[in-house]
């Protein structure tokens, strides 16, 4: 019997020790919650809680409600006093949406949730036996509490969403921890280097810091989560979000050192629109300009129309693209492409001008011959005898000395060794009179004299055959230029494409 009593005492001692161990392992808040429960030994020898309705009802009646807690802690609260002399603030950002990125103004817009957490011992209400161990409050009470007065120092605009009320969340835990949440619409700057546009990357950043307190009073740092996206994949029409970086730096100001929390967004431009609207049309325009090489040297008007229209179309395309870009002073990748393609079209026009110059028809110099009259019968003409000079083997005609200027002109016409008759010869009526006066020495009519001189001119060889061969050579040269251009222009354009795409797609 005594042995059984001894065993019962040992079991009771073990149960008491186990219950104390459970209380010791749990936090004070958990021990307060267990006041509403009874305990029993389970099949493994441990303790499990059993709800006691009487204890719950008694604890509910005696707990402090929200109004009592707020009235108590705010009665002696000083919002200008820094909690504990120095505060550690943890910041966490959740990106809800990135709406736009502007190339003209070099900025971006986004919606975020930003959380701030710090400890304020003056707001501790755990000792009041609260009914709730966290109080969810609105922005009205936040204006009465101490805050780190943090802001985005490099934002262009920052607005709190107010639909249907200010989107500010405040929670105060029983141990004095303050948790705030703001839903903001921000517009921040972007660093744009358009040298490789449209195959470039854009970096946008926002910097968050306490505006009033330096590191001696407020220390700011990222939380474990840092910056997170609310959606796995965020894409815009022109950009794709590549990565988000969080950075913590210490910056020196005249008033001391400040902690700055920077979140950097890296975007990659989507080049599909520019390929469809700029690159592919220019390929077609360049190919159209090459069609003129196959039309031949006789289709100068058609070739001119093709070249000019190609150049105008490319200029119009270039203007539509650059009007949506900032006016930068350096050369962009799209500038290199468009200007190079315009140069190819312009060179095809220069080739056309060269071919047109070579293939143009030169008008032969026509001589107006004096025709004999049909009513007057020609009389035989006996020209003066011709004497050969052995010294120079030239022909000298014996002739009467001219009496006046008209006869001198007529003699010059007769002695013309090249068979050339001036275009205006015979228009003056005095020449006919000179022929009549000159006919007495030749015993023939004036018309017969002219015919005689024309017959003599036909016996002299001309350059007709040489002029014809020169025209043929020019046409052959024009054809060769077109034949070479058909292969040279595409070959040079392919070389340009290889160099262009290899350079600008590197690192994209």
From Swiss-Prot:
Membrane association type: Multi-pass membrane protein
UniProt KW S-adenosyl-L-methionine keyword: no
Annotated signal sequence range: 1-18
Taxonomic superkingdom: Eukaryota
Topology feature Cytoplasmic, residues: 296-301, 357-480
GO terms, biological process: chloride transmembrane transport
GO-annotated cellular components: axon; presynaptic membrane; synaptic vesicle
Disruption phenotype: Viable, with normal growth, reproduction and locomotion. Increased sensitivity to the acetylcholine esterase inhibitor aldicarb, but normal sensitivity to levamisole, an agonist for postsynaptic acetylcholine receptors on muscles. In response to induced acetylcholine release, the amplitude and rise phase of excitatory postsynaptic currents (eEPSCs) during synaptic transmission is as wild-type, but there is prolonged and slow decay of eEPSCs during the late phase of synaptic transmission, which results in increased release of synaptic vesicles in cholinergic motor neurons.
Subcellular location field: Presynaptic cell membrane; Cell projection, Axon; Cytoplasmic vesicle, Secretory vesicle, Synaptic vesicle
Residues with glycosylation annotation: 65, 134, 175, 201
GO molecular function per UniProt: extracellular ligand-gated monoatomic ion channel activity; transmembrane signaling receptor activity
Tissue note: Expressed in the nervous system, with high expression in cholinergic motor neurons and weak expression in GABAergic motor neurons.
Stretches the record annotates as Disordered: 374-407
Keywords: Cell membrane, Cell projection, Cytoplasmic vesicle, Disulfide bond, Glycoprotein, Ion channel, Ion transport, Ligand-gated ion channel, Membrane, Signal, Synapse, Transmembrane, Transmembrane helix, Transport
Extracellular side: 19-274, 322-335, 502-508
Chief location: membrane
TM spans (from-to): 275-295, 302-321, 336-356, 481-501
Disulfide bond residue pairs: 190-204
Primary role: Probable component of a ligand-gated anion channel. Negatively regulates synaptic transmission and synaptic vesicle release in response to acetylcholine in cholinergic motor neurons. Role in synaptic vesicle release kinetics may be in association with the ligand-gated ion channel protein acc-4.
Family membership noted in the UniProt record: Belongs to the ligand-gated ion channel (TC 1.A.9) family.
Name of this protein: Probable ligand-gated ion channel 46
Species of the source: Caenorhabditis elegans
Higher taxonomy: Eukaryota, Metazoa, Ecdysozoa, Nematoda, Chromadorea
